[in-house]
A protein has these predicted regions:
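Short solvent-exposed loop/turn micro-motifs enriched in small/polar/acidic residues
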Residues: 14-16, 79, 87
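Generic beta-strand structural signal
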Residues: 3-5, 19-21, 29-31, 47-51, ...
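Fold-independent oxyanion-binding glycine-rich loops
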Residues: 7-10, 36-37, 54, 68-71, ...
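Glycine-rich beta->alpha junctions and the first turn(s) of the following alpha-helix
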Residues: 83-176
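A short core secondary-structure module
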Residues: 39-77
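Glycine-rich flavin
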Residues: 1-37, 41
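Helix-rich catalytic cores of soluble enzyme domains
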Residues: 31, 37-40, 53-55, 129, ...
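Short beta-alpha junctions and helix-cap segments that line functional grooves
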Residues: 36, 78-82
């Protein structure tokens, strides 16, 4: 089974701290979710989805997190992912069109904003680790390429390899 996360929304800089999608409560205790989610990796192929929306039916809004089961009528995957080098992830935009979560599929309901709720904290913590690992890998590879490049290039002025230039060595040391 493939589990996807539909958290990010267009133009929503609150991310996990508040949704612009709607979570409409149903009489049976479940919710219907409406709105757009972006960068939903493997949305075309997922069996289950963790997502959230805002329930504004009470005195104070609540962020409602739930397991959702995609279907053709209420879960539309847009064919809009075309980022060079990342095509395989298929991180398309998804339109939630009343996708239903029964009461037992509701993971948590929390006030919008920073939270130590285990669901919110768990998603946030793992995302930050994955994001940091990605940028660490990019930086490490850039440093490796820089080191290799200065060994093979030479100064026109004195034919010395750039690896012997004190300013270039200083910049590489700073990057490390």
């Amino acid at each position: 089974k493939l589990l996807a996360f539909g958290i990010s929304e267009p133009s929503n800089d609150r991310v996990l701290f508040g949704s612009i999608s709607k979570a409409e409560p149903q009489e049976d205790g479940g919710y219907r979710f409406y709105g757009k989610k972006v960068f939903l990796s493997m949305g075309k192929y997922c069996d289950k989805l963790v997502s959230f929306g805002s329930d504004t039916s009470g005195e104070s809004p609540l962020s409602v997190f739930a397991y959702l089961t995609p279907d053709a009528e209420t879960f539309e995957v847009k064919d809009d992912w075309n980022t060079l080098g990342m095509k395989a992830t298929q991180s398309n935009t998804v339109e939630l069109k009343g996708i239903y979560a029964a009461e037992e599929q509701i993971l948590t309901k929390v006030a919008p904003g920073p939270s130590f709720d285990p669901v919110v904290f768990g998603i946030f913590a793992y995302f930050e680790i994955l994001l940091a690992a990605t940028y660490h890998g990019i930086g490490k590879r850039a440093l490796e390429i820089g080191i290799e490049t200065v060994k093979t290039r030479h100064s026109v002025s004195n034919d010395a390899p750039y690896s012997q230039d004190k300013n270039i060595r200083w910049r590489i040391a700073e990057a490390a």
